[in-house]
Every structure is written in structure tokens, then in C-alpha cells.
């Protein structure tokens, strides 16, 4: 059973890899199932053992690729936290966002694919296997819990941050308009701080030092 399951995983991974290559080169609308199986060197019937249609492949790829970006960003943040102490949870959130942006900056094809197709539902339900299968939302939540501040409507707050980053970085990274990404970051991160402050609960003790 182990070998059989391993072969199944390999076939599914090969189909996903082939589809990702074609989707990023041609777009999903211009890619057919026949082209995917040809690229993966498999029979067309094999495709339907794993996926209902190419849209299901797309959803799987979006979740997988975004998952990897977030996983690497979280690992980078954790490494930084081992090396130094940060005074606020806001700085931790910004470091996480910065790690995500830097990955997308280095991989424009990935940015095009994720930004065009990543819905809030997909993002909020993504699970990171290497982090005990936790939701991406759980990672944000764990950062917020490190703070002695309390936040209201945390899901809405995170939604606003994610959508802000997604909307502002796309044209800046891909088309370099209206500014370069390094110039955008300063104002973007200040806006993220403002969002976090806006959602602070009135019960938070403003005089208490915040540790992250």
C-alpha cells in the first residue's frame, strides 16, 4: 500500500506541476486538460482519477502555492524571533508581510497566478502541513495572542491587511507603477500599523508593554 500511495502522490504532483507551468505561461482559459496530461506525459483518463476539471486543479494549485509562500514567510519570521526581540506585535505582522512580499517580488509569475485567483475563502482555509496542519489564519492569530493587547473582529482585520497587500503590490511589483516596491513598503507598513491600532479593543491596556 505504501508504494501504491506513493505512486498516486507522484502522479498527482506531476499533473499539478504540468498545470502550473501551463497556467503561468498561457493562463487557465487557454489551457486544456489534454495539454496538461500531454505535459505530464500521462493518459487523459489519469487526470480524472485525481481532478474533476481544470478549475479544481487551479484551486488546488492556488492553495498549494500560497501555502508555500506563507510557510516560508512564517519560518523566516520565527528565525528572526530567535535572533532578536521585537517590541510590538505590529512589527511581527509586518515582518511576516515583508517576507511574503519579497518572495512575490522574486517570482513575478507566482504573483500573477496567486493575485489573480486567491480568494479570501481559499486563504482563510489554507492549512500548513509543516506547521501541524494549522490554518494560515491560526498563524496570524498566534502572533496577535503574543501581544497583551486585545483585538476585535480579528478576521475582518486580517482580511483588510491581506487585501491591502494583494491590491497594492500587484502593479508595483509587476509594472513598477506608481512607485517601486521598496518605496511602497514604507507607507504600506504604516497603513498596516494603522489597521492594527484601529482594531485594538478598548479593553487593551495601553500602558502595558507589548512583547512579541
Question: What are these model-derived regions, one by one?
Answer:
Residues 1-10, 200-212:
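N-terminal intrinsically disordered/low-complexity leader segments
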Residues 51, 58-72, 114:
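Alpha-helical DNA-contacting segments of helix-turn-helix folds
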Amino acid at each position: 500500500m505504501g508504494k501504491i500511495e506513493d505512486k498516486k502522490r507522484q502522479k498527482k504532483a506531476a499533473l499539478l506541476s504540468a498545470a502550473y507551468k501551463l497556467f503561468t505561461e498561457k493562463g487557465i482559459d487557454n489551457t486544456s486538460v489534454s495539454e496538461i496530461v500531454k505535459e505530464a506525459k500521462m493518459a487523459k483518463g489519469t487526470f480524472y482519477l485525481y481532478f474533476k476539471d481544470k478549475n479544481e486543479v487551479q484551486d488546488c494549485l492556488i492553495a498549494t502555492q500560497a501555502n508555500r509562500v506563507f510557510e516560508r514567510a512564517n519560518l523566516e519570521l520565527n528565525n528572526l524571533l530567535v535572533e532578536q526581540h521585537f517590541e510590538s506585535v505590529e512589527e511581527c505582522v509586518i515582518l511576516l508581510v515583508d517576507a511574503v512580499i519579497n518572495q512575490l517580488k522574486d517570482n513575478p509569475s507566482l504573483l500573477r497566478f496567486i493575485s489573480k485567483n486567491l480568494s479570501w475563502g481559499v486563504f482563510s482555509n489554507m492549512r500548513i502541513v509543516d506547521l501541524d496542519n494549522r490554518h494560515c489564519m491560526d498563524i496570524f492569530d498566534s502572533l496577535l495572542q503574543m501581544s497583551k493587547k486585545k483585538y476585535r473582529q480579528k478576521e475582518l482585520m486580517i482580511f483588510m491587511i491581506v487585501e491591502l497587500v494583494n491590491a497594492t503590490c500587484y502593479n508595483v511589483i509587476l509594472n513598477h507603477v506608481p512607485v517601486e516596491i521598496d518605496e511602497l513598503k514604507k507607507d504600506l507598513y504604516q497603513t498596516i500599523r494603522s489597521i492594527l491600532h484601529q482594531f485594538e479593543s478598548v479593553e487593551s491596556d495601553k500602558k502595558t508593554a507589548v512583547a512579541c
